Amino acid sequence: MKKAISTNNAPAAIGPYSQAIKTGNMFFLSGMLPIDPATGEFAPGMAAEQTEQIFKNIKALLAEAGLTLDNVVKTTVFLSDMADFAAMNEVYAKHFSQPYPARSAFAVKTLPKNALVEIEIIASEA
């Protein structure tokens, strides 16, 4: 059975979807934008700062489900410009330790609200 996971410590969904879903021992987080939930505004700065805010939001949703970044098994990173990959990757690397989650990264034409970075995750309790 699936259960919606939500918290006020991460930005609310901006469409007909859940912030996250937990089913069995699996946790699926919708694509997370760099929105500060306290202000509803993007984190100031460029790709590195946006990535840092995204991780704050991800950690808040994981905590709501009783999980941490150690439970993350897969990430998908979307960039509006692949030139921002190095800046995103530097911040990303600070948040994970080995064994790192599997990851895919894509450059896309545009992201919601013209974000520079969006990250979605899959985590497991096991």
Predicted regions mapped to residue ranges:
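Short, polar/acidic, helix-capping and beta-turn segments at strand->helix junctions
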Residues: K2-A126
